[in-house]
Amino acid sequence: MTRDIQTMAVKDVKKVVLAYSGGLDTSVILRWLQTTYNCEVVTFTADLGQGEELEPARRKAEMFGVKEIFVDDLRETFVKDFVFPMFRANAVYEGQYLLGTSIARPLIAQRQIEIAELTGADAVAHGATGKGNDQVRFELSYYALKPDVKVIAPWREWDLTSRTKLLEFAEANQIPIAKDKRGEAPFSVDANLLHSSSEGKLLEDPAEEPDEIVYQRTISPEAAPDKATIITIDFEHGDPVAIDGIRLSPATLLAKLNELGKANGIGRLDLVENRFVGMKSRGVYETPGGTILLVAHRGIESITLDREAAHLKDSLMPRYAELIYNGFWFSPERRMLQAAIDESQKSVTGRVRLKLYKGNTIVIGRESPNSLYSLKHVTFEDDQGAYDQVDAQGFIKLQSLRLRLAAIAGRRGGSL
């Protein structure tokens, strides 16, 4: 049940650490590793706030005879050291995607390598398919952290080349298969404290509207309350620290924003994106708390960042987002950009007031001890000499110099 030319020699692997969710794919992989590689398997299940009971994953691993089982609560680390640094950059991939899956992979990979060192494992394995981005994200992270690590990627090795064959293998090996509310095999779902994504089945046709059953973390905007919810978010050096004046830990704060976003129909996205491997894919994403946080962070930046610093930061953001999407979290260029972004956030402290209403997040107020907004300069009333409007004449004259010279030379930018 392998493609021999791609399969690592069985004798080369003694113990492997598997990133294990307890779902169909990784449960099949667990059994496949045991039978194909005849090696000891260590399972690692990361609690990233996916909102599901993780003990079933432990029990499944025990059912397969796994002796070393790790179920680690990484929620605070995930938000503090991965999500918040990314949001300081306002990172958005292709103008829409808030990178909820992408940002989780380097942390999972990092902990896998730590567990491999701890248990003496000589290999790591993941459940990402050979068509997607996650295989790249996992493996780039593995190699950045442990260059000589052996990596097993079952989807690139076995002959279970479809979801149907996977289900057949599961049934033949008495592996429990989850069902959705309709009693069918579920969509391919990834979830953590930042977001959830759904792919596969009817979503593979980009012309088909998703059924409401696809959505797990948000109500529809149409079903949201007719009365707006007003909240405040406090920031310190670019990171959110409080909601409505109550200080919260990073994970608790994001969880609270998720609750607020869900209740107001915020954070749904139906997206066709360009994968790093070259193909387009369609997914349905729900990022309620992250959507609120992005709007709020831009709101506080609007009064605390210098214009040129803000514009430079915005110009760097697409590259930064692409690095995370493509799996280069541990790259020197990402760290370099992060240093510049973090430098820009030193003055990004203050409070943003927001209105949440039927899928919308609207900034309705912002204040900061570091505000660069000067009422006496911008007022339409008497500024008492704070700004001499005559100065604008020379400014415009200098700015227009190259345009006037081009016109004199007969090289007008457009026809008259």
UniProtKB/Swiss-Prot annotation:
EC number: 6.3.4.5
Chief location bin: cytoplasm
Catalyzed reactions per annotation: L-citrulline + L-aspartate + ATP = 2-(N(omega)-L-arginino)succinate + AMP + diphosphate + H(+)
Binding site residues for ATP: A19, Y20, S21, G22, G23, L24, D25, T26, S27, A46, G127
Domain of life from the UniProt record: Bacteria
Record NCBIfam families: argG (TIGR00032), PRK00509.1 (NF001770)
Protein name as annotated: Argininosuccinate synthase
Source organism of this protein record: Granulibacter bethesdensis (strain ATCC BAA-1260 / CGDNIH1)
